[in-house]
Amino acid sequence: MTENCLFCKIISGEIPSKRVYEDDYVYAFLDIYPASEGHTLVTPKKHYNSFTDMDPEDVARLFEAARKITAAVEKAFSAEGSNIGINNGEVAGQEVPHVHVHVIPRKKGDGGRGIKSIVWTEPDRTNLNDVAEKIRKSLKETERPQVTIPG
């Protein structure tokens, strides 16, 4: 737990929340400023400021929990789909520096939009090969070993 982290305090019970799911590694609770009814935040119990700092095992656990919670939220609210996302870093809209996945149930006509509504610029499509190569090179430099989650 990080001393001044809002989500660490929620996970420890110091600050109340509307918990919907908990296991040894993940805690999920309702967003207090929901984008739609059922908007749930899924967070690792271990404190990570950034998604890219996470251990591979915790990434797998977080996303498996997010998958289960998305299915439950969609069923509970008769949603026709969901936005599932992470704001990674302050510039991307991360308001609490503790990794969390937003699960936002969606219905036709709800007024919401898709992921491209977050930021959209017209990229230069003539340099897609260069862009892809830049990412592949960076992946090789930052690659971690593959992980198999037991059980």
Describe the residue ranges of each PLM region:
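HIT superfamily nucleotide-processing domains
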Residues: 1-151
